[in-house]
Amino acid sequence: MDINSTSPLNASPQPDSPPPANASAFAHQLSGFQYSPPHAADSLLPQVEADSPYLDTRHPYSQYLDSAYPYPSPCEWQHDLYTRTRERSPHPSEQRPHARVLQGAPEHDQDQHLEAAGPREGSWQVGPSRSGPSQAGLSPSATPLNPSPPPHATDLETKHPYSQYLDWANPSLLDWQQDLHTRATASPAPLTAERGRSPQPSEQQPHARALQVPEYDQDLIWQRVDAAGPQAGPWQVGPSHSGPSQARPSHAWPSSSAGAEPAELSDFVMDSGVRAWDHWFLAPHMASEDQMSMLRATGLMPTAEVPTTTFLMMGMRHVAEFRGEGVIRIRPSVDFDI
């Protein structure tokens, strides 16, 4: 097939058009076909409105571009609500709504209200504002520590539009003067006097006063222990030959002989050649042969006639008890019932 040949099918969209006579007529007919507007039935794009900027060029996306800009011009962003709010400065009349409300309501004039109410005891007194600047002062019964609210704050008959807010702003209705901290701050004189007063000697040493009471005398306590016997008092350390310290008087404990101190046997050298304290057992125990030899040598061996004897071991009292022939029990004095 010759592609350069002309025919009614490929040369003209109209089948009834006559075939071209020569090449120039064919070119003229072809150019007219390329630039001729299509028919309404052959158009694949919907028709746009008459005011579309793309109507003449028939842009394929003109309908979407028109819907993306609802405003007449895409540069008119200043018509946005938020932008207009930010750019617009408030009018002076809109800056003080409360002042305009008070000035626009003559029936709630403060001067007329004060003249009608009159002075009250313990309330704020406000001078006339028409003659000059407002002068405020305290009534004779009002003090800085006991202020009273303005009359328009508590007068319920006038029905002031801001009475509820003024009531909260009034400190006297909140009873702040009853607060402990406020009262202490308002009257610092008692606190200063309390801090300036030095404590008495009786308040500084309560324990010393208790020890000075006669019934708490330590000597009387030890005398009662002596009267109760050796089993009633606590363990106390008596005088030691190895040092000058003495914990309790000698009369607090029974001795082997009347009026004599118990013998100190710490340095006694036993038959084994060691001192008694080096191998001593501080607990109730049965006496060994060396210990019984020590008691015989010192004359403190208990017998059936003298069942108990007392001696000191490093200042600690010990009692030797006779339990039978050749059986001696030694116990420290701290163990009363063993």
From Swiss-Prot:
The keyword Transmembrane does not apply. Signal peptide: none annotated. Residues 1-48, 85-158, 187-209, 230-259 are annotated as: Disordered. Its main location: secreted. Keywords: Nodulation, Plasmid, Secreted. Residues 1-14, 126-138, 242-258 have a biased composition (Polar residues). Residues 85-97 have a biased composition (Basic and acidic residues). Coiled coil: none annotated. Putative symbiotic effector that modulates nodulation in legumes. When delivered into the plant cell, modulates the activity of signal transduction pathways that culminate in activation of PR proteins. This is Nodulation outer protein L. It comes from Sinorhizobium fredii (strain NBRC 101917 / NGR234). The gene is nopL.
